Amino acid sequence: MATPAGLERWVQDELHSVLGLSERHVAQFLIGTAQRCASAEEFVQRLRDTDTLDLSGPARDFALKLWNKVPRKAVAEKPARAAEREARALLEKNRSYRLLEDSEESSEEAVGRAGSSLQKKRKKRKHLRKKRQEEEEEEEEEEVPEKGKKTTGGNKPQTEKPESEDEWERTERERLQDLEERDAFAERVRQRDKDRTRNVLERSDKKAYEEAQKRLKMAEEDRKAMVPELRKKSRREYLAKREREKLEDLEAELADEEFLFGDVELSRHERRELKYKRRVRDLAREYRAAGEQEKLEATNRYHMPEETRGQPTRAVDLVEEESGAPGEEQRRWEEARLGAASLKFGARDAASQEPKYQLVLEEEETIEFVRATQLQGDEEPAAPPAPTQAQQKESIQAVRRSLPVFPFREELLAAVANHQILIIEGETGSGKTTQIPQYLFEEGYTQKGMKIACTQPRRVAAMSVAARVAREMGVKLGNEVGYSIRFEDCTSERTVLRYMTDGMLLREFLSEPDLASYSVVMVDEAHERTLHTDILFGLIKDVARFRPELKVLVASATLDTARFSTFFDDAPVFRIPGRRFPVDIFYTKAPEADYLEACVVSVLQIHVTQPPGDILVFLTGQEEIEAACEMLQDRCRRLGSKIRELLVLPIYANLPSDMQARIFQPTPPGARKVVVATNIAETSLTIEGIIYVLDPGFCKQKSYNPRTGMESLTVTPCSKASANQRAGRAGRVAAGKCFRLYTAWAYQHELEETTVPEIQRTSLGNVVLLLKSLGIHDLMHFDFLDPPPYETLLLALEQLYALGALNHLGELTTSGRKMAELPVDPMLSKMILASEKYSCSEEILTVAAMLSVNNSIFYRPKDKVVHADNARVNFFLPGGDHLVLLNVYTQWAESGYSSQWCYENFVQFRSMRRARDVREQLEGLLERVEVGLSSCQGDYIRVRKAITAGYFYHTARLTRSGYRTVKQQQTVFIHPNSSLFEEQPRWLLYHELVLTTKEFMRQVLEIESSWLLEVAPHYYKAKELEDPHAKKMPKKTGKTREELG
C-alpha cells in the first residue's frame, strides 16, 4: 500500500491526465473523501453530488482506483471488534437457548448465569467501544508525516489523517452548528412576532374597554352635574314664556269685556275688578318697556371687537415678513423713503407703464422657444378654466365619480375576479392608485381579517396617497387606511388598506414568506423599475404560483405593459383611457449653457406673458430646487407689484409633510403657483391646476462601479419616456404647454428610449442578504425581469462573506440572519452587531442613526457662513467625523431635544428629529436581534473599534502621493467638510466614497492598522498592513580605509 505522500503524488499525476489541472488541496480532499466512504460506489456518488466532475469514462476509473489505493482501518479487524463480534454471537446463542423447554429452576439458573456473564461482557464491550472511539478521535487530530508507517497492535493508529481533512471537518462542524443556531434564531424571532401581535390585540381590546368605561363614567358624572343647571335654565325660559302668554291672555280678556260690556252699567265689584286688571296690564307693559330700554342702552355701550377678518386675497409669507436678517428694518425704512421721494400720480406716470416688465423680458435674457409637436388629447376643452375652479370643486364623492377609472369600475372588478394576475395601464391621474384599492375594499377583499397592500416607489407618494384615501373614506389615517415607510409606521391592527414603499413589502417576506395576511398585492408605478420593484416581481410571481387565491395587480403608466405581461406568463392587460387635453411642446432654438438660470428666466417669462395657470418645473435634487426657489423669490421681490403674485413651492423627499401639503392647496385668486419638484412629480403625484411644464431634460441617477465599490449620484439626461411623462402633466385639467430647455435634435438623438433599471446600476448587498434570508440561494438563476451584472452580484456575495453574513458555501449564517432584520446597509448592520462585543451599543446606535439622515445635519446660511463654520468646529472631537456626529446628538439630547439649541448651533432640527426616530426604531430592533444595550462611558476607542468591525472594507492609508484605498489602491481624498481634513492621519476608515469633482471620502474615522487584523484577520494579512516608508535601515558601524584594506 502506498504511503500518504506517495498516494498524494499519484492523485496529482492522475488529475493532470483526467482534468488537465492539479492542485494539492484538491488531491487531499479526494483522499479524505475516499477514506470516509465504505464502498467505491459511495465514493463515486459523493463525487457526483459535488457537480464538479463528469464521472464517466476515465474519471470513474480514476475514482475506483483511488478508493482501492486509499488505506482504511476496516481492512484488519481489531481485537476489540473481534471480542464484540464474539459477544454478539454468544448473545444470539443465549437467546436461542431461552426458547427450549426446561425446568423452571434450571432455566432460571441458566438465564442468571448467562445474564451475569452477558452483563460482564457488555461492560467490557462498552469499555472497548469507548476506548476505540477515543483512539479514532485522536487519530483524526494527528497530522500526517511525510512518510507514513504502518503500526502493529490494535491500540495504535494504522494511518494518520492529512491536515486538510481535519480542517475541513472542523469547518463543516462549525457550519452545521451555525446553521442550527440560525434556524433557532429565526424561529425565536417568528415566535416573538407572533406573541407580540397577540399581545398588541389584547392590549388594544383592554384599552378600548377601559376607554369606553371611562367615557361612560364621565358621561354619567357630566349628566348629574348638568341636570340642576338645565333645570334652572328651563325654569327661567318657562317663566319668560309664561309671562308673555299671561299678558296676552289678560289683554284679550280686557278687549272682550270692553267689547261686550262697554255700554252696560257695571256693579261696584265689577268695576273694581276691571280696574285691577287694567292696572296689572299697564304694569306689565311698563316692565317690558323698561327692559327694552335697558337693552337699547346696552347696545350703545363699547364692546370688544369680534374677529371678522376673512381669508386674505394675497398669500402672506410669514417667513419673509418675520425675517430677522441684519439691517432688515433699516432697509425697509430706506425703501419707504425712496418710494415717497419718487412718488408720481396721474397721467405723468403713463409713459413708464409700457416698459414695466423690462427686468424680465430683456432681449439678452429672453429664451426663444419653437413649437414643434402637439400631444393630442382625448377631450377638447370648451374654454380654459379659471383658476378659481379649484376652489369650487364638488364633494369628494363627486370628484371620485369624475375620475377616468370610475366608468370602468365593474369591468375592472370582473377582470380581477377572473384573473389572478392583472396588468393595469393608465395615465397618471386616472385614479388607479387611490380608487382601485377602495373598489377592492368595497367588493369585500378585506373580509376575514385580510389586507390589501399597495406599493409605491417613493416615501412621499406613499404618505400623500394614504392621506388622500383616508379622507375619501372618511376615516382617520392610521386606522383603516395607513402607510408604512422606512423608520415610520402609521398603521394599526385595524388597518386593511396599507400603502407602503416596495422595500417595506420586501421586508414583509421575512416574517411572512407567503404573504398569508394579504388578499391583494398591488405594485404601483411599476414602470419606474426601482431596485425593490424588480425584486418584488420575482418573489410575487413565485408566491402567486403557490397561492392561487392571491390577486396580483401591476399598475403602470403606459410604459412597458407588454413586457410586464410577458414576464407574468402572458397576463391580461386592462387599459384605462386617460383624460388628457392637448399639450403643445416647445423646444429651444439653441442649447442652454445653464439650465438652472434658464428655468428661472422661463418661469418669469411664462408668468408675465401667458394666461393664468400653474407652472411645474422639474429639477434634479434638493440643492437645485432650493437654489431655484431662492432665485425666483429674490427676483419677484425686486420686481415688487409690477407683476402679479407668484407662489414658489418646492417638493422633494426630505421636505416636511406640512410643507409638502402646500402644493395641493388651491391657488389664491389673482396669483400663480409654481411647483419646483424632482422627478417624483412625473408619475407619483398629481397636482391639480398645472397648465405649464418646464423640462430641463435632466435627472439624478445613482450609478455604481463594482470594481472600485464607489457610488456616484450624477446628473444625467433623462430618457424619452420620462420626457413624455413630464409633458403629460400639462394636460390634466386643460390644454397645456410643455417648454423643453433643449433642442428637438437633442431629443431625437441624445436621449435614451427608457431609463436603465436601477438593479443594473446599484449595489446589491441588501438585496442579496434579503434573498438569502428568504431561502433563495441560486441567485444566478433567480427570475429577474432584467438580470443585474454578474460582476455586481459576485461583489455583493464577496462583501457579505467578508462581513460574516455568508459561510464558505454561500449559506446565510446566524450573523447574516440578524443583519437581515435591520433595515440598514449590511456594513451598518455589522457595526451594530459588533457593538455588543465592545460594550458600546448605545453610542453605536446614535452613530448609525446620524449616518442615516443623508449628510444633512449642519447648514450654512449665506449671510452667516463664518458663524456656522465656527459652530461646527465647536463639535469636533479627536478621532473623526463619527465622533462629531455622536457629540452633536449627545448635546442635543442634553438640551432636551430643543429646537432653539439647533437654531443657535446651525443644526437642522428636522434632520435631528428624524435621527431620533431612527435611533428609537433601531433600539427596538436590538431586542429582536438579541443584542443588549450597553454604554462605553466615554471610552471612544471601543466605539472606533466597533465601527471598524463593520467598515473594514472601507479603509485607506496615507502614502507619498496622498490617500489610497488598501485593497484597490485607488486614489481618494478627504472631504473638505471633514474634521480630519487638515490633520491627515496615516490610517482612515470612511463611511462612503462618492464621486463629485473628485473621489471624496465622506464621514472619515481615524483608526490603527492593528485593529484591522483584530476585527478582520480573514480579510487582511499582516504584510498588507506594513508601512514600507516606516521601515528603518539597520544600524551598522562604518569602517575606516585601513580596516577595509
UniProtKB/Swiss-Prot annotation:
Chain positions of motif DEAH box: 524-527
Region (Disordered): 101-211, 1026-1045
Source organism, top-level taxon: Eukaryota
Residues reported in the UniProt entry to bind ATP: G426, E427, T428, G429, S430, G431, K432, T433
Top EC group: hydrolase
GO molecular function: ATP binding; ATP hydrolysis activity; helicase activity; molecular adaptor activity; pattern recognition receptor activity; RNA binding; RNA helicase activity; ubiquitin binding
InterPro entries referenced in this protein's UniProt entry, alphabetically: DEAD-box_helicase_OB_fold (IPR011709), DEAD/DEAH_box_helicase_dom (IPR011545), DNA/RNA_helicase_DEAH_CS (IPR002464), HA2_WH (IPR048333), Helicase-assoc_dom (IPR007502), Helicase_ATP-bd (IPR014001), Helicase_C-like (IPR001650), P-loop_NTPase (IPR027417)
Annotated catalysed reactions: ATP + H2O = ADP + phosphate + H(+)
Entry keyword set: ATP-binding, Cytoplasm, Helicase, Hydrolase, Immunity, Innate immunity, mRNA processing, mRNA splicing, Nucleotide-binding, Nucleus, Phosphoprotein, Spliceosome
Extent of Acidic residues compositional bias: 135-144
Gene Ontology cellular component annotations, sorted alphabetically: cytoplasm; nucleoplasm; nucleus; U2-type precatalytic spliceosome
SMART domains, A to Z: DEXDc (SM00487), HA2 (SM00847), HELICc (SM00490)
Ranges for domain Helicase ATP-binding: 413-577
Domain Helicase C-terminal: residue ranges: 602-775
EC number: 3.6.4.13
Predominant place of localization: nucleus
CDD domains assigned to the protein according to its UniProt record, in alphabetical order: DEXHc_DHX16, SF2_C_RHA
Keyword ATP-binding among record annotations: yes
Post-translational modification Phosphoserine, affected residues: S103, S106, S107, S164
Feature: compositional bias, Basic and acidic residues: 170-211
GO annotation, biological process: antiviral innate immune response; mRNA splicing, via spliceosome
Function field: Required for pre-mRNA splicing as a component of the spliceosome. Contributes to pre-mRNA splicing after spliceosome formation and prior to the first transesterification reaction. As a component of the minor spliceosome, involved in the splicing of U12-type introns in pre-mRNAs. Also plays a role in innate antiviral response by acting as a pattern recognition receptor sensing splicing signals in viral RNA.
Subunit note: Component of pre-catalytic spliceosome complexes. Component of the minor spliceosome, which splices U12-type introns. Interacts with GPKOW. Interacts with TRIM6. Interacts with RIGI.
Family that this chain belongs to: Belongs to the DEAD box helicase family. DEAH subfamily. DDX16/PRP8 sub-subfamily.
Protein name stated in the entry: Pre-mRNA-splicing factor ATP-dependent RNA helicase DHX16
Organism of derivation: Sus scrofa (Pig)
The encoding gene: DHX16
